[in-house]
């Protein structure tokens, strides 16, 4: 890594491969599985759903450990990445009621709302502790995308809103797949506060649609308005990437 003293680089490599980072991720994995088990007291679930959620979270932890080993620029994961991992744990916990056939509802909304609130904490902790990184920003984005997808599946299974809700839940993954064919889509985007605002609106709408406070027609209208906002955001990003492609 450029600009890092050789002794510092050696310390980072040791932390990633066999030092503090694997141990910290291991402890966080245990805490996350415990969080998922505790969430089962709030949301519907059965033993097979709990097992699936736990295994999904352990897979997330394994992927995080691998990505950190490849290029994480710090020697500890920090509270910021612990919070993001716990958010991922809550997303995995939401698989339990979905797999149990009890999609949506107030409990699902409460768990998802907690994950949304924590979304503002990990970035703050990263900046305050000096542990901000491209990895952390990407991990935060992927946690948001996973939450949106799982909530969309709940909506399809439990409400009158149809498969069109996947515009809110799967657009990020379509964008990533498109980037595999079009390399210019993988370029870094400039920071835009409106992008974060639209993400919050996206998740908030998906949470709102979990609970029976809107008529079916109102729910569909709200979903479509949020989808238009999200589509506009992605269109603006794609336009910027196209104009700056080399």
Stretches found by the model and what they are:
Residues 1-77, 141-246:
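A feature for the membrane-embedded catalytic helix bundles of lipid/isoprenoid biosynthetic enzymes
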Residues 49-63, 76, 82-133, 217-231:
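Membrane-embedded alpha-helical segments that form the functional core of polytopic membrane enzymes
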Residues 89, 117-125, 138, 142, ...:
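Active-site His/Glu-centered metal-binding helix of metallohydrolases
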Residues 111, 136, 164-167:
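Short, surface-exposed loop/turn motifs that are enriched in glycine and acidic residues
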Residues 131-132, 136, 187-190:
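Cytosolic-biased juxtamembrane loops and peripheral soluble domains of multi-pass membrane proteins
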